[in-house]
Structure formats: structure tokens, C-alpha cells
Amino acid sequence: MERKNWFNKEIEEIEKELKTHRENGLTQEQVKQIREQKGYNELQAGKKKSLFQRFLDQFKDFSIIILIIAAVVSGVVGVQQGNGITDTIIILIVVLVNAIIGVAQESKAEKSLEALQKLSDHASKVIRDGNMQVVPAKELVPGDLVVLDTGDYIPADLRIVEEVNLKSQESSLTGESVPVEKTSEIIEETEIGIGDRKNMLFSSSLVTYGRGKGIVVETGMTTEVGKIAGMINSTEKQETPLQQKLNKLGKTLGIAALIICVVIFVVGLIQGKEPIQMFMTAVSLAVAAIPEGLAAVSTIVLAIGVQKMVKKNAIVKRLPAVETLGSSTVICSDKTGTLTQNKMTVEKVFWNDAIRDLSNIQEDEIDKELKKLVYANMLCNDTKISQDGTLTGDPTETALVDMAFNLNFDPSIYDRTPRVQEIPFDSDRKLMTTVNEMNGKYVVFTKGGIDELLKRCSAYEINNEVHQNINEHVNQIREKNEEMAKDALRVLGCAYKEIDHIPSKEEMKQIENDLIFIGMVGMIDPPREEAKVAVEKCKTAGIKVVMITGDHKITATAIAKKLGILENDDEAITGAELEKMTDEELAQNVRKYSVYARVSPEHKVRIVNAWQKNGEVVAMTGDGVNDSPALKKADIGCAMGIVGTDVAKEAADVILTDDNFATVVSAVEEGRRIYDNILKVIQFLLSSNVGEIIVLFFATLLTPLFSKWFGITDINSLEILLPIHILWINLVTDSLPALSLAFDPANSDIMERKPVKPGKGVFTKGMTWRVIYQGIMIGGLTLAAFMIGLGTTKIPINGLTLDQSKIEVGQTMAFVTLALSELTHVFNVRNNKKSIFKTGIFNNMKLIGAVVISALLVFVILWIPGLREIFSIPVLPTENIVELVCLVLAPIVIVEIFKLFKINGGEE
């Protein structure tokens, strides 16, 4: 699409190109013809997934597919053998519950475009055929002449043809918090950012001051906001690091399960076992190899994290986003309102030839000159003060009134000094003047830009003395002005003079002459104190903080230095400089820069993409329409809840309800805690499952030996664990403790370690070692329990005869030991370095409760006769209780020894 620089064209040229007129607009016939060509002034929505499609997405995980296959096969075999489909139903219920939770917790249908369309639902005043009329904004076409007043939404991209003191709020597009002064003059430069196109008005912005007319030059998807809509549509969400790791884990487990099943099936056939029996054993192994509860538990752990994050002022829309925050290696943050207070504040005051910090001025230091300076800023000011003290008006002007209140000036000054005349601010003069009645006299107060103000001053008041020749002081005043400007302060000067009567309109034209200069104030949108602490916390945690703003470079670098984001000026770059780089060059150099100023929405997306190309997990904060594509492109998008636009909120994964950068860092910390806890869940479930696999594997491979030792003639009769035992332990007994690990508190050093590398899988060396040796431990204890239940601990055994009752006692001992030893083992996984006696057993009471309930569920099977029959479990002999207790507590003793000798794998 050809890019047209409307700001770079004369009005006459635009009239000719669009066949319109700056006074009469288009004709109705022209409007009809143009609409047929260009369509309506509205935004196009992107494709959305249906509820059914999102439901089906939940079944793409490889381990879930294996479970479904196992469930179907188990059901077919169960029906053929007359055993029913209990196992199938249990597996399918778990899979279904996981899918429902996933869909319920995902964000609702993407509404970014719907929110954008709401911006164009307003009515607009337009001149057609020379007559003013009101039409829906969507009916505007290029060439229409739009009339705008204070408070009007701008319905399309307009080239200004007429303006009177016109200002517009473009922060949602540019990120700049201060309203932009507009002009109708041509701009000679050809390559400038949106924020510098002073003769243009942009769709979705707001007229905050003055009035004007503009010719519609772009509508719908060709407006600046439309281009953003197009970027939102074309931006696809990537899988989160956790999703990638769990998918990889699922595939690994699925392949491992298939290999084990094939090996067991073939070995069993070689041994002469029944094919159907071996098929069911293989299915049992598949069920044992894949932790059925992992997907559901991981989902619920994330959901619990979502609830905890709400209390920390972060609303999570997309469930996996919780963990992604914890994996973040780069945070790209908007400046205004996130890193700063989004409130212009006077920081420095210049009077009596000295610059002072406002916060250090004591009440007894307020002399005659400072009073005049403050009065000038209060009275030459259009800020409105409500009964409850709320200030409304231009941010610059409210900052000046706020300064007066901070110095304890009495608001009654407004009643005692009524305004009798004024000259409003305009962009040509860069000044505002009022005439106020004060103590029976009339005082002229003027404030504005230093250069323009000094031209109109003839004297300078210092230390209660008026120096009639200001030229002697001009250089020093300018130096002080530059000193404040270098700190990125917006500087306004003030002057006054006394007159003896209310000036007429003619006299007002010359009133801004022979003024007495009294001082200057410097203001800025200051950084949040908590943001500085948060940035330092990020550095310690190995997270790079990058400022991306539509504001000017000098302001951005000053704020970034105060926050500790930037050390040297060469770490800052502008959008114009960025525009000259290719994507490859940006990706190569992106680590050099910490501040990006005067950037466009396209630039923000490119910056995020450059970091992602470097293998980083990027979190992005923003509040405006201009931030939306980058919010969606980032691995995790965080929108502001207070000042954020609907568009930004819909494009984001997380909404910060307090608009605070510190909340992002708190959310990162919470994300790390959740990620740690999910790893604990994985370690717990996998080590338990490895134990189950070992038991089944050994039972199959060693059946001939057992048969020889025990004199069993039926090779199919010896099973240590039944499929229903495995299902009960995996789905019921283990799930509650695994779920309760979600409530484990964060380790004290959680924000002192580097982020987990994005490409790093779950199976690190340490994790693999722990899963294997702890699985062997649980499997070995279960086999030992089986032997004890048989009535012997000696191998080999000669001359021992076994009947079915002894086998059932052995199975019961194995089942109870496996279930309860896994419950004690859950305490081992809470910290892989520190002893459980140092980390504390009772600092997660939900885990204690879950272990107690799960243990009771095991005993319920032992105690209730009907359930004993279903599970083929006899009453447990009392003589085995002591051995059982020792076996159940053994995991804690063994792992504590491994931790003591530092062979447990440690944290990674």
C-alpha cells in the first residue's frame, strides 16, 4: 500500500487530490461514489476460534492422545473379558476435566477489534454541500470536511485546514501524556513520527482544547489506528515456555510408554503368557508411565496462581501467562504511568537567581518574590478545582496549582482576586496572560515559554528589588533554563506588572509588554519510587528492563537514568534512527539499547521481535491503542487497568489494576514461584510413576523366577499391582498432594537467580537424576512390601508354597506402601537442597491436609468391604504394621541422606 505523507502537502494539493473544498466539503453524490470505492470508515475483525475449536485444542497434547488410546483399548478389552469399563471411564473423566478447565480459564474471544470499532461509533459533525450535518462516524469518506470542538472524538485521520488554539490528546497512539498543540501549516520534513505531525489529527484521539476543521484523508483500515488493527490481526500468539516444555515432556513420556509397552508385551509373549493378559499389562504400564493428573494439576496450579495474582493487582486473562511471567528475561515497559506517576509535577523552582527543589522549600522561606511567582502560576491558569479538591484541566496547569497547594497557599485567593481580562494561550505566542483584581489594584500575570516571555520583559525582580535592565540578567536566566531543561524538565517562566485600570480589548493587544520577570518552574512526570526498587530487583534477577516510549529522547533518558535503566546516553535510540535499521541489524544490536524514544507502533513490534529472535522471553507493558500490536506480539502482554484503553486490555494477557511497573515485577516473582511449584509437581508425579513402572516391569520380567521360587504353575496368576490400583493412586491419592504444592511459598532467593533459559527443558540433569533414583527408591520399597506380604524376605526361596490369599496380602502391602510412601515423598520435593526440617513442614497447611485426606482415602479401601472386593484387597494383617510404617517413612530418610551428602541434584 502506498504511503501518503498528508502532513507534507499543501491544503490546496489535498483539495485537488481528494476533489473536495475546505469550505463546502464534498457533495452528497461524491460521498456516495467514494463510499462505493473505499467502503465504510470501520475496522475489520480478524478470525476468531470457536468455543468448540478451543475445546479441541485441549486434546493436542501427545500424552493426552496416548491416554485416550489407552482408555479406548482398556474399554474394549474390559468388555470382551466381562470386567466392565471402569478404568476407561476414570481415564476419560480426567481427560475431560482437564479440557474443561483449560477452556474455562482461557481468555474469552479476542475482542481487540471490537474495542477498536467502539472508538468509531461516535457521531461526527461534517460539512457537505456547504451545510453542517451530523452523521455516524462510520459514514465518513476521504475528502469529507469535519468540524471539531473541545471534547470531540476524532473519527478519522484528518489534515487540519483551520484551527483556533487546537490541542489533541494522542497518548493512546503516541504514549505522550501531554496534549499536542496543532497547526494547519505544512510540515516540510518527510520522515517524522506520528507525534510530530502537528498538522494532522488521528482517529481515536480526543480534542482537549480549542476548535478546528479538517479534511478526512484516511478512513478505516488505512488510518493509523487501522494499521494497528491490521497488525493485531496478523500477530499470532506463540506457545508459552511452559506449554513448550510440557508438550515436549508429554511426547517424551508418550514415546517412553509405547516402548515400555512393546517390550513388556513381547517379553510376556516369549514367556508364554496370554496375549490378552499381556495387552492389559501393557495398558497398565501406559497408565503408569503417563501421569494422568499432570495436565489437570498443572492447569489447576496455574489457576490458583491466577487467584493469588489478583491480590497482587494483576488480572490474568490467559492461564499459561502466569508461568510465562516467571520465565521473562526482558521487560519492555512503557514510560508514562507505568514507570512514571502519569502526573506532571513541579520539581524545581527558580527565583532570586537560584534553583531550588520544591520539596526542600520551607514555609519560612516563602518571600515576596516566591509568592508572586506562585500567584502568577495559580491565577494565570484555567484549572478547575472541585469541592473535594480534585483538580481538572491541562496536566501542566494542574501541576502549577498543585505546587501552590504543596506550599500551603490558600485556595481562597481565587475568590479574592477575580479575573477581569485574559489572553488565552496559543501556539504562536506560547504565552497566556490574565488580568486580576488584587487589593484594589489590577495585576497582569503572564506565563509561558522562556524565549517568548523574555522578549516581553523589561525588568527583573530579585530579593525585593526590581532591576530595570533585564538584559544584564538574560544570559544567566537562559543558563538556568538550560540547566533545568537538561534534566528533562518542562520549564515555564512567569512575569507580572501592575496597572491602574481594567484594560480594554485594544489595550489588551499591547498588554504583554514591559513585564517584570520573577522566575521559572520546572516540571516533569516523575518516576515512581517503587519502580526504581523494582528495576533494581530485575537486575538482581537477571532481567533486562527496556523503556519504550513515544516521548522525546531527552525526557526518556532523564527518567531512565533516575530509575537505573540507562547509564550512558548512547544506550538510547529514537524511532527515526531505528527506522534506518533492517530487522537483522536490529536483532544484532538490540542488546545495546535500553531506551527507545519517539517510536511508532510498528517500531514496538520490531523491538519485541528482535529480542525474541535473540532467544529471550519478552514481557511488554502498555496502555494505548499504539501498544496493542506489541502487547499481542510479546510472550506476555501487560496492559494498564486504570488508564489503559479497551484495545490494549483486550490484546494483553495480564491487566495491571494499579498501572504500576512494580506490579509487573511482583507478577514475575509470582510466576517464578508457580513455575517452581509446577516443577515440584512434575518431580513428584514422575518419580512416583517411575516407581510404579519399576514394580510392573519387574513383575513381568521376573514372573518365571517367582513362579519357580514359589512353585506357581499358572504363569498368568502373579501380579504385584492391578490396573485399578495404579489408576486409584495416580488419579486420586497423588492428585491432592500434587495440587497442594501450588500453595508452597516462594524460596527466599527466588529473585536472586537468573531466569530459566527458554530452551531449557524440564528434564535437566538434576531433575532426571532425582526422578530416576527416587523412582527406584519407591519401586524398591513397593517390591519389598510385596515380599513381606508374601511372608518372606529371602531370595531365592526354595520350597515355599503360595496360595492366592498370600498373593493378595502381598498385593495389599504393595498397594498401601506405594500409595503412602508417595505421600511422604511429596515433602521431599519441596526443596531439593535444604532438609525438610529447615524449610519447614507446616508452612503449607493445605499440603498437610491433602496428605491426610489422601491417606484416609487409601484406608477407606482397606476398611469398607464393598471397596475391598472391587480392588481385590483383603484385610491387612496386624503383624505387618511395623514393617509398613518403616517402609512408608523410608523415602524421607533416604532423600535426607542424599541431601546431606549433596547428591540430590540440587536446584537448577
Placement of each model-derived feature along the sequence:
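Conserved cytosolic headpiece of P-type ATPases
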Residues: 1-755, 760-763, 776, 815, ...
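Helix-coil boundary and interhelical linker segments in multi-pass alpha-helical membrane proteins
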Residues: 701-721, 788-810
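Generic alpha-helical transmembrane segments
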Residues: 733, 811-826
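Membrane-water interface at loop-to-transmembrane-helix junctions
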Residues: 759-776, 804-813
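Alpha-helical transmembrane segments of multi-pass integral membrane proteins
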Residues: 770-785, 820
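A C-terminal functional module that forms or caps the active site or interfaces directly
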Residues: 829
